[in-house]
């Protein structure tokens, strides 16, 4: 049986899709909440991973080992880095990077975990499906590009500019995607990140995040709905 894995970090990021699912069965493993059911005619496992890279890595490992999904979509909110994007707009990964990893002293690239790729490539078919879904979610614009992950909420303008200097091509940042991508890489499971902006990094981010998290979660969920409808 083919299953699709959907991963969001927080209650707010998984609530919309959870409400749309049918025949839902909840299972908790090691503190990670899995919601198994049907969505848009597909068998899905919706995972609430918890916030941050360690939580994301642990829960994604459990998802892949216990449920063996065909592919994984990382959903939820992000902080915008691309100046053309606004709160509520969508970002789709073509690559994902750990923006806070630095082992350059041993010859690795900035963001590269030793013996891992410098960036993690999203599955091209899933990226194309996300772009196609965008045509049906008309209230947002989107960018496809590099998404950066770090264990910090990016509300400090100085830190934002430091990260931007290292990765000028970043379209958005968040706190889980590279961990999800790294685990998917090790398992050989295709993935893509489809998130919506809850804030613009460095610009009153905490206030914007609280206010627009629901909007971001809804827009991200609408994208996933259209992706699954198209399959």
UniProtKB/Swiss-Prot annotation:
Pfam families tied to this protein: PNP_UDP_1
Binding site for substrate: 79, 154, 175-176
UniProt-listed GO biological process terms: L-methionine salvage from methylthioadenosine; L-methionine salvage from S-adenosylmethionine; nucleoside catabolic process
GO CC annotation: cytosol
Residue positions of the active site: 13, 199
Associated pathway: Amino-acid biosynthesis; L-methionine biosynthesis via salvage pathway; S-methyl-5-thio-alpha-D-ribose 1-phosphate from S-methyl-5'-thioadenosine (hydrolase route): step 1/2
Keywords from the UniProt entry: Amino-acid biosynthesis, Hydrolase, Methionine biosynthesis
Stretch forming the signal peptide: none
Keyword Metal-binding: no
EC number: 3.2.2.9
A molecular function (GO) term: methylthioadenosine nucleosidase activity
Catalytic activity, reaction form: S-adenosyl-L-homocysteine + H2O = S-(5-deoxy-D-ribos-5-yl)-L-homocysteine + adenine; S-methyl-5'-thioadenosine + H2O = 5-(methylsulfanyl)-D-ribose + adenine; 5'-deoxyadenosine + H2O = 5-deoxy-D-ribose + adenine
Catalytic EC class: hydrolase
Role: Catalyzes the irreversible cleavage of the glycosidic bond in both 5'-methylthioadenosine (MTA) and S-adenosylhomocysteine (SAH/AdoHcy) to adenine and the corresponding thioribose, 5'-methylthioribose and S-ribosylhomocysteine, respectively. Also cleaves 5'-deoxyadenosine, a toxic by-product of radical S-adenosylmethionine (SAM) enzymes, into 5-deoxyribose and adenine.
Family: Belongs to the PNP/UDP phosphorylase family. MtnN subfamily.
Protein name per the record: 5'-methylthioadenosine/S-adenosylhomocysteine nucleosidase
Highest classification ranks of the organism: Bacteria, Pseudomonadati, Pseudomonadota, Gammaproteobacteria, Oceanospirillales
């Amino acid at each position: 049986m083919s299953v699709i894995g959907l991963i969001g970090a927080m209650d707010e990021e998984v609530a919309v899709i959870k409400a749309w699912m049918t025949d839902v069965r909840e299972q908790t493993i090691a503190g990670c909440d899995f919601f198994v059911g049907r969505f848009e005619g597909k068998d899905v496992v919706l995972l609430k991973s918890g916030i941050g890279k360690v939580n994301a890595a642990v829960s994604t490992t459990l998802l892949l080992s216990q449920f063996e999904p065909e592919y994984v979509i990382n959903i939820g909110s992000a902080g915008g880095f691309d100046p053309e994007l606004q709160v509520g707009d969508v970002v789709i990964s073509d690559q994902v990077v750990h923006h806070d990893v630095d082992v350059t002293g041993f010859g690795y690239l900035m963001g590269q975990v030793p013996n891992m790729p410098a960036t993690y490539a999203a599955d091209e078919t899933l990226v194309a499906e996300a772009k196609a879904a965008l045509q049906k979610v008309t209230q947002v614009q989107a960018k496809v590009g590099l998404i950066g992950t770090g264990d910090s909420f990016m509300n400090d303008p100085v830190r934002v500019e430091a990260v931007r200097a290292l990765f000028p091509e970043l379209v958005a940042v968040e706190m889980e995607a590279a961990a999800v991508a790294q685990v998917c890489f090790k398992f050989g499971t295709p993935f893509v990140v489809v998130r919506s902006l809850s804030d613009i990094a460095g610009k009153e981010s905490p206030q914007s995040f609280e206010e627009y998290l629901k909007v971001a979660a809804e827009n991200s969920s609408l994208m996933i709905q259209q992706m699954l409808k198209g399959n």
